[in-house]
Each structure stands twice: as structure tokens, then as C-alpha cells.
């Protein structure tokens, strides 16, 4: 995998502000647990995936569970009353599911862990607040953002929309090594705060695919729609699991630096069954039980991106008030008439023979059994799922490749 970038952008403005529709997409030990982000967020992640898939059933999907959950956790710091309750319940924080304090402390540990320098991969992630200078921000909120979420803060004159847009876009471009430019298409001067969460990850395959083995082959978008794609080929030992319950094959292709990309190939016609089966226990099974065996693997090179207006999706998962006049964000500011006017999530991924630039995270190591079996041929020539995991416990990306 070569390139994957992610940004989650949250714009706060007056409650009466009009929603923008830019960038709209119709929508080696066994670890003790698999996590997508802070505790309690796993069901939310898979429910979010299904909501995105339902909105665009024949489209590519790619997003970062980590960044979305961290962004919502940050918002919960400043939310009050029912607004806070909706966010926490959406993330799975409720009776018997952990506390808000555990959510934020786990987020802090995660961010510090992921920012540890590593020789074999590049990782950059963080948070930033761009705030209107005269907006009275609660000191408790600013302090928590800096200490728990390691956020940078920048006073920004939103009354100069073009200047504010340039300032934010320049920051984003710098943090993503120039891979995402012009994230913000327009500002109208009504914004009082912009929250940005970014992640940039770059890693190489543990064993690169041979360029000379890549050839054009058919990819069946549907049984009736066939496109030609460059298909990579490699014979090697890969992590492998045949999941008979969900009628799919799972292949793990490792990166240098203790990260792995898992590719899930449903049996023909069974994609919906696999999507409906995405749960925490399913991921645990895939990560704990695969065998390492020799495969003749055919995997298409692909480049896809996802751009989502989360203010259109999250209400379907119970997180509604922050986008309406009912929003209570008085934990951010005593200015009572602010709400989230737009929440943009953007991710891009490119897969090729050498490796991946992607949004990412870090963690523990998986122990895999090694099977003495003959080489098996697996061809990813129809829609499949992909997830990127760091150290076997942080699920960084989740997506579906329908058309490479």
C-alpha cells in the first residue's frame, strides 16, 4: 500500500448558520483486545461503516475509525447535558461500558503511544484548534485539549475568510506532507472555531511485490461490469484464515514496523453478509486465529478516496444535537449559540507494490500459527474489504474496494 491520508474537520459556528455541502460524497503475543480507538467505540465504528455502505452501496468506502472517534471524544469535552449524552452513548460509553474519564485517559495514552518515533515507518498525527480571538473559550476545555489530546491552538481571524482558509489549509498541507491541500473550500465568516484531527502514515510492505509480476487482469465490479486493473502477484507466507461462518477469506499482508493490512474476500454474492458480521468479536477472531501459510496472492493496485459529511451520517447513529439549535457546547464557550455546522472526514489510499502512505497508529504484536500446507491461489478480482491494523490492537482504517 502506498498512500493513505485522513482528516477529520469540525467547524463550529452560530446555530443559525447554513450547512455547507462541500466535498460531499453520497454516501509476538496475542493481544488482550482489539481496539479501534478509546474503549467503548467499537460497535460505533462498525455501525458507522454500515451507515456509509447503506448510503452508497455500490461505492468505494474508506475512513479512519481512530480519527472519527478521537474527534467525537474531543467534542464531548465541551458538550453538556443531552448533547454530551448522545456523543458518549454513540461511542458506547454508558452503564457498564466504561466512563467518560476512562475514554479521555485512554485517548491520551493512545495518542502518546502512537507518537513514539519509529525507524521503519513514518507516523504523524495530532489535533489543532483554530479559534476566533474574541470568543471566550473555557480554560478547562483548552487545558484538557492540550493535555489529553495534545492539541495545538491558533488564534484565527474568521472575519477574513480567505485568510483563515489559507491559514488552516497551509497547516493541514504541512502536517500531511503536502498530500492534502485545499481541504477547506470556503469559509463565510460565521465560524468561531475549526477543529482539525489529522493522521499521516507511510510504511513499506515487509516483502515488496515484484513490479515485473504486475499485469492487467479483469476485476468484476459486478458479475456484469468488468474493468481491467493492474494486478499484483506474490508467492509468500501470509497470514490466512478461512472464515466459514461469514463465507470469506482473510489475508494479512505485513508492513515493516509491526503493522498489517488485512484483505477480506467474501464469497461471491456474500459481501452484505460479511458487512453485517463486522463486530468486535469478528475482528478478534480474524486477528487471533489466522494461520501463516504459503499463498499465491493476486491483489489489485488501487487508489480510492472517501470524503464524508458526517453531520449527515452521525444523526442516524443517535448523535444529533451537536448539529442543531439544540446543541449545548457551553463547555467550550459561554457563548450559548454555537453548534457544529460541518464535520468533514477525508481519507485517501493508494496501494502498489512497494508500500503505503496512510493515516495510522501503533500497538502490539500478533502471534500466528504456521501451517504446512501447499500453496493456495487467492485472487482479489471482485469487491473486497480492507482494514489496516497497527500492532494487532489498533484498527486504523476500514474500507471497501468496489472499483479499484
Swiss-Prot record:
Question: Glycans attached where?
Answer: 35-36, 245, 258, 334
Posttranslational mods? N-glycosylated; glycans consist of a mixture of sialylated bi- (including sialyl-Lewis X epitopes), tri- and tetra-antennary complex-type chains; affects the maximal heparin- and thrombomodulin-enhanced rates of thrombin inhibition. O-glycosylated; further modified with 2 sialic acid residues. Proteolytically cleaved at the N-terminus; inhibits slightly the heparin- and thrombomodulin-enhanced rates of thrombin inhibition. N- and O-glycosylated. Proteolytically cleaved. Inhibition of proteases is accompanied by formation of a stable enzyme-inhibitor complex and by degradation of the serpin to lower molecular weight derivatives.
Q: Where is this site: Reactive bond?
A: 369-370
Which Pfam families is this protein grouped with? Answer: Serpin (PF00079)
Question: Where does the entry say this protein is expressed, by tissue?
Answer: Expressed strongly in the liver, and moderately in the kidney and testis, but not in other tissues tested.
What compartments host this protein? Secreted, Extracellular space
Q: In which family does this protein belong, per the annotation? A: Belongs to the serpin family.
* Function noted in UniProt: Heparin-dependent serine protease inhibitor acting in body fluids and secretions. Inactivates serine proteases by binding irreversibly to their serine activation site. Involved in the regulation of intravascular and extravascular proteolytic activities. Plays hemostatic roles in the blood plasma. Acts as a procoagulant and pro-inflammatory factor by inhibiting the anticoagulant activated protein C factor as well as the generation of activated protein C factor by the thrombin/thrombomodulin complex.
Listed name of the protein: Plasma serine protease inhibitor
Source species: Bos taurus (Bovine)
Amino acid at each position: 500500500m502506498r498512500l493513505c491520508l485522513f482528516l477529520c474537520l469540525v467547524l463550529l459556528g452560530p446555530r443559525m448558520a447554513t450547512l455547507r455541502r462541500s466535498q460531499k460524497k453520497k454516501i509476538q503475543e496475542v493481544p488482550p483486545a482489539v481496539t479501534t480507538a478509546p474503549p467503548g467505540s467499537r460497535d460505533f465504528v462498525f455501525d458507522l461503516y454500515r451507515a456509509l455502505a447503506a448510503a452508497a452501496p455500490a461505492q468505494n468506502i474508506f475512513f479512519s475509525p481512530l480519527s472519527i472517534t478521537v474527534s467525537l471524544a474531543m467534542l464531548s469535552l465541551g458538550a453538556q447535558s443531552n448533547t454530551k449524552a448522545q456523543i458518549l452513548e454513540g461511542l458506547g460509553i454508558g452503564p457498564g461500558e466504561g466512563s467518560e474519564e476512562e475514554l479521555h485517559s485512554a485517548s491520551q495514552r493512545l495518542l502518546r503511544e502512537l507518537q513514539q518515533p519509529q525507524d521503519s515507518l513514518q507516523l504523524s498525527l495530532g489535533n489543532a484548534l483554530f479559534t476566533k480571538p474574541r470568543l471566550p473559550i473555557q480554560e478547562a476545555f483548552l487545558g484538557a485539549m492540550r493535555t489529553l489530546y495534545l492539541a495545538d491552538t491558533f488564534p484565527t481571524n474568521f472575519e477574513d475568510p480567505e485568510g483563515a482558509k489559507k491559514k488552516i489549509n497551509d497547516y493541514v498541507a504541512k502536517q500531511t506532507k503536502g498530500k492534502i491541500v485545499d481541504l477547506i473550500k470556503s469559509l463565510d465568516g460565521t465560524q468561531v472555531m475549526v477543529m482539525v484531527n489529522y493522521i499521516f502514515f507511510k510504511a513499506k510492505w515487509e516483502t515488496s511485490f515484484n513490479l515485473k509480476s504486475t499485469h492487467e487482469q479483469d476485476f468484476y465490479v459486478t458479475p456484469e461490469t468488468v474493468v481491467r486493473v493492474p494486478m499484483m502477484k506474490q508467492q509468500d507466507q501470509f497470514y490466512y484464515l478461512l472464515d466459514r461462518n461469514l463465507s470469506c477469506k482473510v489475508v494479512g499482508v505485513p508492513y515493516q514496523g509491526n503493522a498489517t493490512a488485512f484483505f477480506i474476500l467474501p464469497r461471491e454474492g456474500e459481501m452484505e453478509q460479511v458487512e453485517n458480521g463486522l463486530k468486535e468479536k469478528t475482528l478478534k477472531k480474524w486477528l487471533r486465529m489466522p494461520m501463516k501459510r504459503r499463498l499465491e496472492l493476486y491483489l489489485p493496485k488501487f487508489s480510492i478516496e472517501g470524503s464524508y459529511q458526517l453531520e449527515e451520517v452521525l444523526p442516524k447513529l443517535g448523535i444529533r444535537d451537536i448539529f442543531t439549535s439544540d446543541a449545548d457546547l457551553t463547555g467550550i464557550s459561554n457563548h450559548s449559540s454555537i453548534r457544529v455546522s460541518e464535520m468533514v472526514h477525508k481519507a485517501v489510499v493508494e496501494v502498489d507494490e512497494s508500500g503505503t502512505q496512510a493515516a495510522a497508529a501503533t500497538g502490539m504484536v500478533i502471534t500466528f500459527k504456521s501451517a504446512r500446507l501447499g500453496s493456495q491461489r487467492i485472487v482479489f478480482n471482485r469487491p473486497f474489504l480492507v482494514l489496516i491494523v497497527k500492532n494487532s490492537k489498533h484498527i486504523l482504517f476500514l474500507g471497501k474496494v468496489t472499483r479499484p
